[in-house]
């Protein structure tokens, strides 16, 4: 709704809209070296939903009247060249102060990368219809051609929900987005990763969940996101999924489809340059089918498009050809990238300003990418040889940079140049996965499609197992050569699915084919996993006896001499833990003595073992005050995040009423990153989610759902089953 004049002369609407947008930024930016892109001419035009030429007349009038001022400044994320930016003056603010905004209800809260609001033209009926459906509790798939304005309409609907006090959780998809990534956008860092836990944490009445750009999902992750939407469909929140037709998951169950078409002729006119006469405007709008992006890209200096000319053909024949060589080079670099880029990341920055001035780029903060229609048209114009050459050049360029993101980019371009390098993947995939396992999964999936190398498929299977993706892991395991490696992965898959008996049978078969040293290592790893495969609390005596007998049966002498001490250490740690839990003081003392002899009395780990012994002696369900004081000091002194978490968990287990310092200590490590490629860390992560459910009872169900998922990912099916039982009893 337009503001109403309370006193004084009314400014033209175009000028009022400019002033209202500029007034959202503080006066301190008038002398700032770096200013937001929204104050640049392309950013201002974008937010107002007009072409840049439509700003010239109202801006000139506002500047002549002293309502705005212009200067050259560096635009954040826009490269090194200074650009013209616009500021509202005190006089401009005074002019706005005479305007009275309609009263609004308390504004709701938004989460995630919610785009900047822009003014829509000719979409009032669509916005009202879509808003009415969502606010009434429906779930909707918003579909349409690329560039037709789906995201802009979704943003307008989100604004309507916010103005009515709703909570809006927004996620935008890319090729590396998975269900867990959507959860982080909806809920923030530390969000759960399983679909059921994500929905449990984000669901609520008067809540709108938005999933934008769903067509960008890689097939590797589409099924997981579809599962997320299936989980959300019957819940309290309304869900808006936005996708180019057809969507990667069809029309989800419980969703209705809302197809967005081109603009009507009377509304298309407002997107053309202001100096376009009415006859030309009608012909152009009809020729381009009312397509909003194509209309914004048309210039009055160009020929009127042929009637019936497809929008894609118009983009290729006209928009692309008007670019300079520098603009085309920068556009190609954007188009081959797997994700949006900062301008500072470009190797060919010269054409970035030209692309921005031409309304070819879309922005999210400082990250930019071409509008997807333009990107798709440009990609489609390349021959296979041209595409291969571009990717090969980009791979070489990114190889000169450091860091996991650079390796992700290098890997993408290497694979898409048709030359997946198994040795390179083996060397770098863990660093990529540690920063973004979803990106690593996509990279491996692309490499598997192009290479017959067994090691690449093994890496793809291992990553799927670590991520808890049973179906994907199985598809890769089935294509591996028969042997020990395949059997061990099949055993992991069985445990992931909760079939411990089959897993044990497969492992026994695999061990029969191992060397004695390999068999010993596998036995120790199995013992450690079985010891951890339970919820916090006293160990079952039967399990304790089984593990003790199994530990005593391990033949350490079969290991190479250099590895025997670490093998003995692992077994003695298990013996010590079991003895403490069942109250077997003599056995605990023997294990402690063996550990002290192996590590030395002054080793930092001995202090931890001594503390565990003191914590095991409890009165009334709680460890002594002296033991808790020592625990607090030891926790605060530990820098290793894994060790600190294990200590915190040990103290939580030793107390029925948890002191404030302990609760705060756990909160401080609740979202600290752990390595998914390490089995020990996967188990630790599952236990951490369990304790979050204990300490945060209002979110217990969501946290424990995630804990169940994490226990399965850690191959702890017994702990997962036990926790499911506790959840059922709690409900």
State what each model feature region is.
Residues 101, 107, 322, 363-365, ...:
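A structural signal for repeat-array scaffolds
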Residues 103-130:
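Conserved adenine-nucleotide phosphate-binding loops and their immediately adjacent elements
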Residues 123-126, 152, 224-298, 310, ...:
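Alpha-helical sensor/transducer elements of the RecA-like P-loop NTPase core
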Residues 177-196:
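Conserved NTP-binding/hydrolysis module of P-loop NTPases
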């Amino acid at each position: 709704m337009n503001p109403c004049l309370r006193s004084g002369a009314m400014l033209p609407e175009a000028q009022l809209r400019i002033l209202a947008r500029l007034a959202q930024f503080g006066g301190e930016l008038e002398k700032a070296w770096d200013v937001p892109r929204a104050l640049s001419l392309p950013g201002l035009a974008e937010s107002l939903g007009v072409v840049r030429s439509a700003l010239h007349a109202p801006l000139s009038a506002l500047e002549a009247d002293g309502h705005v001022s212009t200067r050259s400044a560096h635009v954040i994320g826009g490269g090194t060249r200074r650009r013209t930016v616009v500021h509202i003056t005190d006089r401009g603010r005074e002019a706005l102060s005479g305007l009275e905004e309609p009263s609004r209800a308390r504004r709701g809260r938004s989460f995630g990368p919610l785009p900047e609001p822009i003014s829509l033209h000719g979409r009032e009926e669509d916005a009202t219809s879509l808003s009415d459906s969502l606010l009434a509790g429906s779930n909707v798939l918003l579909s349409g051609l690329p560039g037709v304005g789906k995201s802009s309409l979704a943003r307008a609907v989100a604004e309507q929900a916010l103005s009515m006090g709703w909570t809006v959780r927004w996620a935008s998809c890319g090729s590396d987005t998975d269900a867990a990534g959507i959860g982080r956008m909806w809920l923030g860092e530390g969000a759960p990763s399983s679909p059921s836990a994500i929905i449990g944490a984000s669901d609520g009445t008067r809540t709108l969940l938005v999933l934008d750009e769903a067509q960008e999902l890689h097939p590797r992750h589409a099924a997981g996101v579809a599962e997320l939407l299936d989980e959300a469909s019957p819940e309290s929140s309304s869900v808006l999924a936005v996708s180019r037709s057809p969507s990667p998951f069809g029309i989800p169950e419980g969703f209705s489809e809302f197809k967005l078409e081109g603009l009507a002729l009377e509304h298309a006119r407002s997107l053309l340059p202001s100096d376009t006469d009415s006859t030309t405007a009608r012909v152009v709008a009809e020729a381009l089918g009312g397509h909003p992006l194509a209309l914004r890209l048309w210039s009055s200096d160009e020929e009127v498009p042929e009637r019936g000319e497809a929008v894609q053909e118009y983009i290729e024949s006209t928009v692309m050809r008007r670019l300079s060589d520098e603009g085309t080079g920068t556009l190609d670099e954007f188009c081959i990238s797997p994700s949006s880029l900062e301008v500072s990341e470009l190797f060919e920055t010269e054409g970035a300003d030209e692309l921005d001035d031409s309304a070819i780029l879309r922005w999210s903060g400082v990250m930019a990418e071409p509008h997807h229609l333009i990107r798709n048209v440009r990609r489609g114009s390349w021959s296979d040889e041209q595409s291969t050459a571009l990717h090969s050049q980009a791979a070489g360029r990114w190889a000169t940079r450091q860091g996991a993101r650079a390796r992700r980019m290098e890997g993408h371009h290497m694979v898409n140049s048709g030359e997946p390098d198994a040795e390179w993947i083996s060397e770098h995939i863990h660093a990529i996965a540690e920063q973004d396992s979803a990106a690593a999964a996509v990279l491996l999936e692309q490499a598997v499609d192009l290479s017959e190398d067994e090691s690449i498929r093994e890496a793809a299977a291992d990553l799927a197992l670590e991520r808890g993706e049973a179906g994907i892991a199985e598809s890769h395991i089935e294509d591996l050569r028969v042997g020990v490696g395949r059997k061990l992965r099949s055993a992991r898959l069985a445990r992931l699915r909760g079939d411990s008996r089959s897993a044990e049978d497969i492992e026994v078969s695999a061990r029969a084919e191992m060397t004695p040293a390999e068999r010993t290592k596998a036995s120790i790893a199995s013992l450690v996993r079985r010891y951890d495969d339970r919820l916090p609390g006293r160990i079952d005596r039967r399990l304790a006896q089984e593990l003790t007998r199994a530990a005593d049966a391990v033949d350490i002498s079969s290991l190479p001499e250099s590895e025997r001490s670490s093998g003995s250490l692992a077994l003695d740690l298990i013996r010590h833990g079991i003895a403490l839990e069942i109250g077997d003081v003599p056995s605990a003392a023997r294990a402690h003595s063996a550990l002290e002899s192996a590590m030395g009395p002054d080793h930092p780990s001995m202090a931890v073992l001594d503390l565990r012994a003191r914590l095991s002696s409890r009165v009334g369900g709680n460890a002594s005050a002296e033991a808790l004081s020592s625990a607090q000091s030891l926790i605060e002194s530990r820098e290793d995040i894994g060790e600190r978490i294990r200590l915190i968990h040990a103290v939580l287990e030793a107390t029925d009423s948890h002191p404030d310092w302990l609760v705060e200590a756990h909160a401080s490590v609740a979202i600290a990153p752990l390595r998914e490629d390490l089995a020990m860390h996967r188990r630790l992560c599952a236990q951490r989610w369990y304790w979050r459910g204990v300490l945060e009872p209002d979110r217990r169900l969501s946290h424990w759902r995630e804990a169940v998922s994490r226990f399965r990912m850690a191959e702890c099916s017994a702990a997962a089953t036990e926790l499911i039982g506790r959840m059922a009893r709690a409900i």
